[in-house]
Amino acid sequence: MEQPGPRAPDPSLCHHNLQPTDDPNWDSYATTMRTAFTPKTGAVPALIRQNGIRRLGYTYSLSDPILNQTQYSDEYTWKSHSKEDLIKTETSRGIKSHKSHLNEDIFLWTLPHCQQTGTLKNCLPWKIPASMKEVNKALSNQFISLTKRDFVDRSKAQKIKKSSHLSLEWKKLLPQPPDTEFRRNYQIPAKIPELQDFSFKYGCYSSLPVASQGLVPSVLHSYLRNQEHTKKQTTYQSDYDKTYPDFLMLLNSFTSSQVKEYLQSLSYKDRQIIDRFIRTHCDTNKKKK
């Protein structure tokens, strides 16, 4: 008969590593951070360096001598080629490398255009005895630049230009592409000679790049207008203070008794001035009627 296994612990007690309340060491302030994220201790690997390591494709061991050599220096540094593997011939048995003499067909030699190649076809170039003239020419050709060889001298170019029967209007004979909308709208505007002669340079024509001709007024209307605007202190005065006040309309708004009372309150000189003004204006209005 099978014996019952160990009893599983109560899940209420296992959750968050909580202990029963009967234990006096039970921490009532235990949080999830302290119970779930407990410090874990693991095995620390031994700090032992490997005997062999691959660095940039170059293998070496600790016992080998230290060399400043990597895969880059192996591939991209100059090496003296071995004379054994200069020529590799392929046979029916496979690829075989062996020593062989240099064949004269390997090298391609170019001769000058003026030199005949028929007589020297069967003779190697280094076996031809060079004359003193050829030696001097070879030495002088070392100092001829590409510009002097490829480009014609300016004096020769002028002779060629004069000898050619090309018309002076050769630019008009060139094929012109059709005008596009951009070329038609954004081309340089044509200068009309009638509009270029201005005898004044102010107003709407002041921005034109043309010097003024003839008499120019010393005081412009724009200067007077700007001066009038600077005298005004407020916008109301600049907008509504353009006309003088109508004194006759003011006098007609008052009665004769009000005018007499106002005149009596003034001094003798002011009263004479206002009386003269009223009589002159009243007489002119009566004559007009």
Curated annotation (Swiss-Prot):
Protein's recorded name: Testis-expressed protein 26
Region entry Mn 2, spans: 69-83
Region (Mn 5): 233-247
Region of interest (Mn 1), ranges: 30-42
Region: Disordered, residue numbers: 1-26
Positions of region (Mn 3): 144-157
PANTHER family found in the cross-reference section: TESTIS-EXPRESSED PROTEIN 26, TESTIS-EXPRESSED PROTEIN 26 ISOFORM X3
Annotated disulfide bonds: none
Region described as Mn 4: spans on this chain: 179-193
Phylogenetic lineage: Eukaryota, Metazoa, Chordata, Craniata, Vertebrata
Cellular component, GO annotation: cytoplasm
